[in-house]
Amino acid sequence: MQNYDRQFPTFAASFSIPSNMKVLKFGGSSVGTPERIRGLVEILKSYYQQGEKFAVVFSAFSGVTDALIAMGTKAADGDASYLDLYETVRQRHLDAAAELLREGYLQQAQPELETNFEVLKSLLYGIFLVREASPRSMDYVLSFGERNSSFLIAQVMRQAGINAAYLDARKVIKTDN
């Protein structure tokens, strides 16, 4: 087991979970469209305004996990059409950001989303080159769905006046597989 106090000293030293904290989970259909995202942010805003303590976990946008699986599979099969799926998913996230975020927030979010998608594209290209998608590689590919939706929705929450921050779970959770 890694010592997270040493690896993430600020986080480990400053983070404690209040006993009255709620953990809310929203699945893919709940975050499937900009309209649904707006609706769930309104729900979260009411919790926030009531002084509720909560953490939120978001799934990938509806259909994105399946698209990511298909991208990885196509890349491993040497099928360059993985790039078409990649571009569709990338554009869907950028369009959602443009629809959900006002100019200042959009300008902050777009570079992060683009960076995430460039990393995904490089990963898929590596899979394409070696014609192999290991379980670990596919786990990494799939992580982009939740990471991108969570990042984007955190920005929408901030824009709505909720004191929210995106937390990349890879920095605080260690798995054994």
What does each model-found stretch correspond to?
Residues Y4, F8-N177:
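Nucleotide/pyrophosphate-binding catalytic subdomain
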